Structure formats: structure tokens, C-alpha cells
Regions:
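C-terminal motif of bacterial Sec signal peptides marking the signal peptidase cleavage site
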Residues: 27-28
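Active-site acid/base region of carbohydrate-active enzymes
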Residues: 93-101, 108-111, 143, 155, ...
Length: 620
């Protein structure tokens, strides 16, 4: 009988060899792909740097532009921008150019200031160039400070915002009263840091999500707390039995939106000194700065001198905006105290993190219960319940863009968000805020809508665009979780219209005409709104957190761009680069779409989906 050969060792060796060969092929294939991705990263980075360099040269030649407020000018701004800003490129050349322009504009507003009050040197960020009568002594103004924090936080060098925060939170601006001059149109004295509404504590929180620094935070927390205490003491409704009791109030002027329609409706429904305003004549007294002189000359102003200041009514409003800012600040205080190693205990034995969380919840509940109108499906404005003159607790039944502010701060209860979602239909409606050239500040179907007057009762205001676009992005990304193509396209259309309004020689001004506008009006190179942050966080979905991780979830419609690159982004002391290409290999059939993320030049994550969330853990 022939003995059968034992083939097992041979087969085992064959299988082992095959496995090794297969593994080598897979590794080789993976290495080749990684090499392709790395080569494309190098190419896009170089292209973006070259484009930025050339465009800064172009921007520096523009005539009739304000001179820089600080040390960065045409002699040195190129090197500063190349070494500091997140690089960005896409297949849309308009948005590319505006992105780079906005950083060039921002560099002109980074100002050094020697404060004679405390003999310290600060970096501040200006809105207008020079020192306006309504500004702090440094020239900085609190009204756009929240937006400035959200944009400037993306610079690699963190010293600018740390110093800016220091100036407003514990420098002279935190306690020096706003100077009273011809532009001081209220009878309430307050520090420079509170002359206009703001959400600076939230802005500092947003900054620390990009550039964490627990030691600096520990030093700053008591001053952030004091900052909020000033808002609590001066700007809350004191009449305990009013509907708006305990809510935050402000003149619309010092909320940055003078001559608002909600104020118009409240004034018309007032008596006493404000019987001056009627449905037929209010435009003669409250429609732009050329009309307040008429009010100043009125019998009512003479009989009630404290009801007006230079013809502007001392009429306080409980607006969705200022209450949302308070919520954002309180929630930020809670988060920052929780992040701090020694969070502190208040006088009642409660942790400060819990204390501020409960206060934020109370503001949230009041906004939902008082300002939300179920019939209008919108957040409306009330007149303050403790107004000395004029209507109290009067609801102005008009939709204004400030009604979207709660979404900016993710203030809507997550489990109940669908009950508030109908408000966003007005963003896409020509009866609401949608117009040919851009977003309006009031609903167009209201009979008092007016986009021509210098008044925020219709005219476009980029400050509000920044609020609403982030609010809408938060609604799609954080509440709905998934979004339809038309929803993404609406956000993109608004961003593109805003970019296009900058013109061939980009410029950002104070206002635009939503129906026919081709360019911005007002002072050129004006820093009161965001754009880099709109691209980085809202559209491309780079989301920073206090933990050592980040996520990317673009809301970019897949059919709009062929590619984008976002890189040179400094985050938690790491360098981040992101590329999405619709087709990585044109020689292969079908789309080879891929989203790639590098950390410190190492490819760490990829996704074949543009719009699914990609999470990256930075922990070793």
C-alpha cells in the first residue's frame, strides 16, 4: 500500500505566504493612497499660500481705504497673515478671495493700546478706524466684540484675544464709565465694557475651545463673573409682577439696531411722552438719525425731558438678542467653572458651575415661555416691564432677524426643538427674510418694512447675517442632525450672496440693500461681522471643544464645489489640515470622493461622505 504524502505543512506554508503577500499588497496600496493624499495636501497648501500672498499684494493697492489701526500694514501684513491664519481654498474663487480679504481687513483692526489708566499695554480689536465718540477710550467697541472673538480665535497666535479679553474684563474698560457726550443717548451710566450689548464671556469660551489655557482661565474667571454681574445689576427688569420680570432689557440702539420695528410698535402703543408717535407720523420722528431732531423739538420732549435724549426715546426692550447673549454668557460661565480645576462654591454652598447652569436654564425657560409666540411661530420682542416711560410688557408682533438669536447659542431645548422649527421657514420666504441680494433684518410682509432708511427695520446688516447663519447651521447640525439638500443649499446661497456683495475689489461695510444692493454702504473695511468663522465652523463644520478632540461635519452641498482645503489651523497645540475632493482619481469611473484629515502632517481620518460627521481624537 502506497503511503499518502502529508500535504498539510505545504498547504500551511502556502497559505502563510499568500497571506503575507496579500498583506503586503494591502499595505502597499494603502501606502500609495496615503502618498497620493499627502502629495495633494502639499500641493493645496502651496497653492493656498501663493494665492494668499498674491491677493494680499492686490488688497494693499486698493485706493481710498482706511489706514490700519495698528502695526500691521502693507509693509508687513503679508508675512503676518501667511504665518497666522488658517489657509483656505476651494473651487469657488469668489469665496476664496473674500475669505483672504476678510483676514487682511481683520489685520488692520488689531491695535496696540497703552492704557493711561493702569499704565498697561493691550491688544484691542476695533470696529471703526480711529476712536469714535461712542467707543471706549482705546477705540474698541463692545457691540461687535462677540463676532470679533469668533473670527480672531482662529489666528494661530493667541495673544491678541487674551489681551483683548483682559482689557474688557479686568482692565480700565471694565470699570471706567462710558464717557457722556453728544453720542451718549441714554441716562444709564455704565462701564465701557457694557455700553453696547455683547456676548464676550461666550466668546472667550469659544476662544478657549481652540486655544486651551487652564492657568489663564483660572486667573480670568473671577473677572468674567463680575462682568456678568454688571449685566445682571443694570440690565434686568426689576418689576417683580411683570411678565418680563428678571429678563434682560436694553435700548435697541445699544443692541446695535437703532430704529427697530419692535420699538416702533411699542412707541405707537405708548402714551404720555410717547404719544408723539402714531401710525401715521412715526416716520417723522423715528426713521433714521435725520428724524430724531424733530422729536427733540416736540412738546412731549419738552414736557418729559428724561423720556428722550437728543430726541431718542429712553424706551427699553426685552429682545431675543440680549436675552440670548445672557444665556450664552451664563452657560459659558458654568462650563468654564466646571473646566476649572477648582470651580468654587457660592455663598449658598452650591458649586458655581451648577449655579450658572441653573441661571442659564432659567433664562432659557423665560425666553421660551415669554418671547416665543405660538401664533407667529417666532421669538418676538417685548417692551420692558419696568419702563419709566411708555408701554410695559407690550409684545411687538413683528418678526425681526434677532428672533433667530436663540439658535446661535443652541438655546432651544433639544427634546422640544421641532416645536420651534417653523421659524426657519421665514428664512427661505420672500414674505420673511429672503431677498435677491441678501437677508433682511425684518420680515418683508410687515407694512412698516423699509430697507432704504438708515434704520434696522429691513435694511441688510452683516452683523445679523453672522448671527443668523450660525443659528441656522446649529439648527441643521445640532438639532436636526441630518439636513436635506435644499436646506444646505439655502445656507450656501446666503453665504455666497454675502461673499458676492463684497465686489470685485472686496470690501465689507456696515449695511446693504437686500433687494437691489450690489455693494456695502458705510465705512470701508469695517469689522462688525464674521466671515472666516462662517466658512470654518458654520459651512465646513470644524467644531472645537474643550476636550482633546474635534469633529468635522460640512453643510456644504455636494454639488457646489469640486474640492476644498482648510489648513494651517492651530488647534489644541496641533496643526490641522482638511481636504475634501469630489474626485481624487479622474481616470477611474464614478466619483472618488474623500474627506481627509491630517494632524501634525499625519493622515489620521478619512471618510467617503462629505456630510457625515468625522470625529478625531487627539489623545495619544
Amino acid at each position: 500500500m502506497n503511503k499518502l504524502f502529508n500535504l498539510s505543512p505545504i498547504l500551511s506554508a502556502y497559505r502563510l505566504s499568500f497571506t503575507v503577500i496579500l498583506a503586503c499588497l494591502i499595505i502597499s496600496c494603502s501606502t500609495q493612497k496615503s502618498l497620493v493624499y499627502d502629495q495633494e495636501l502639499k500641493r493645496m497648501k502651496t497653492t493656498s499660500e501663493n494665492r494668499l500672498s498674491a491677493q494680499v499684494d492686490e488688497f494693499n493697492t486698493y485706493p481710498n481705504r482706511p489706514e490700519s489701526d495698528g502695526p500691521f500694514n502693507k509693509t508687513n501684513n503679508k508675512s503676518f497673515l501667511l504665518s497666522n491664519i488658517p489657509l483656505f481654498s476651494s473651487s469657488d474663487m469668489t469665496i476664496n478671495k473674500v475669505y483672504n480679504y476678510r483676514w487682511w481687513m481683520i489685520s488692520k483692526h488689531l491695535k496696540t493700546y497703552h492704557d493711561p489708566q493702569d499704565n498697561k499695554d493691550y491688544w484691542v480689536v476695533t470696529e471703526f478706524f480711529g476712536v469714535k465718540p461712542w467707543a471706549s477710550l482705546s477705540g474698541a467697541i463692545t457691540c461687535p466684540a462677540g463676532h470679533q472673538f469668533y473670527d480672531v480665535r482662529w489666528l494661530r497666535d493667541e495673544k491678541f484675544l487674551k489681551s483683548y479679553a483682559d482689557y474688557f474684563m479686568r482692565g480700565s474698560a471694565s470699570h471706567l464709565d462710558q464717557r457722556e457726550n453728544g453720542n451718549f443717548l441714554t441716562y444709564m451710566s455704565r462701564p465701557e465694557s457694557h455700553h453696547f450689548s455683547s456676548w464676550m464671556v461666550d466668546g472667550i469660551d469659544a476662544f478657549l475651545k481652540i486655544h486651551p489655557d487652564k492657568k489663564w482661565l483660572h486667573e480670568m474667571l473671577p473677572y468674567l463673573e463680575k462682568h456678568q454681574q454688571v449685566w445682571d445689576s443694570l440690565f434686568t427688569v426689576r418689576t417683580s409682577d411683570s411678565k418680563t420680570a428678571g429678563m434682560y432689557k436694553i435700548l435697541d440702539l445699544y443692541d446695535g439696531m437703532e430704529f427697530s420695528l419692535s420699538a416702533v410698535l411699542g412707541l405707537i402703543n405708548s402714551d404720555g411722552p410717547y404719544s408723539l408717535y402714531t401710525k401715521d407720523n412715526w416716520r417723522n420722528y423715528y426713521l433714521g438719525w435725520e428724524t430724531t431732531g424733530n422729536a427733540e423739538k416736540s412738546i412731549q420732549a419738552k414736557n418729559y425731558p428724561k423720556a428722550f435724549r437728543k430726541g431718542y426715546p429712553d424706551f427699553y426692550l426685552v429682545r431675543p438678542s440680549v436675552n440670548s447673549y445672557a444665556y450664552g454668557n451664563l452657560r459659558a460661565l458654568s462650563d468654564l467653572y466646571r473646566l476649572n480645576d477648582s470651580s468654587g462654591i457660592n455663598k449658598n454652598g452650591q458649586s458655581k458651575a451648577d449655579y450658572y447652569a441653573s441661571r442659564a436654564t432659567k433664562v432659557q425657560q423665560q425666553v421660551m415661555n415669554v418671547l416665543w409666540n405660538k401664533d407667529d411661530q417666532f421669538f418676538n420682542t417685548y417692551s420692558a416691564g419696568d419702563n419709566i416711560f411708555g408701554a410695559r410688557d407690550f409684545e411687538a408682533r413683528v418678526r425681526e432677524s434677532v428672533g433667530y438669536t436663540p439658535w446661535y447659542f443652541n438655546m432651544i431645548p433639544v427634546n422640544d426643538y421641532k416645536n420651534y422649527s417653523k421659524a426657519w421657514e421665514m428664512l427661505a420666504s420672500r414674505k420673511g427674510f429672503f431677498n435677491t441680494s441678501g437677508m433682511t433684518t425684518a420680515e418683508q410682509q410687515h407694512p412698516y418694512y423699509n430697507e432704504q432708511a438708515y434704520a434696522w427695520n429691513g435694511r441688510g446688516w452683516p452683523f445679523e447675517n453672522s448671527i443668523v447663519y450660525k443659528g441656522y447651521a446649529n439648527y441643521l447640525r445640532n438639532y436636526k442632525k441630518s439636513s436635506t439638500l435644499p436646506e444646505k443649499e439655502l445656507l450656501y446661497e446666503y453665504v455666497y450672496k454675502l461673499a458676492k456683495m463684497h465686489g470685485d475689489k472686496p470690501n465689507i461695510g456696515e449695511w446693504y440693500i437686500p433687494s437691489t444692493g450690489k455693494e456695502f454702504g458705510g465705512e470701508a473695511d469695517y469689522f462688525h461681522s464674521t466671515f472666516p468663522d462662517i466658512i470654518i465652523e458654520d459651512l465646513l463644520g470644524f467644531k472645537g471643544v474643550h476636550e482633546n478632540s474635534f469633529s468635522v461635519k460640512p453643510l456644504l452641498p455636494k454639488n457646489k464645489w469640486d474640492y476644498f482645503y482648510l489648513g494651517n489651523l492651530r488647534y489644541h497645540n496641533h496643526d490641522i489640515d482638511i481636504i475634501w475632493k469630489k474626485d481624487w482619481d479622474a481616470n477611474k469611473p464614478g466619483e472618488q470622493g474623500k474627506l481627509c484629515v491630517w494632524v501634525d502632517n499625519k493622515l489620521v481620518a478619512t471618510s467617503s461622505s462629505l456630510n457625515e460627521q468625522l470625529n478625531v481624537d487627539l489623545n495619544p
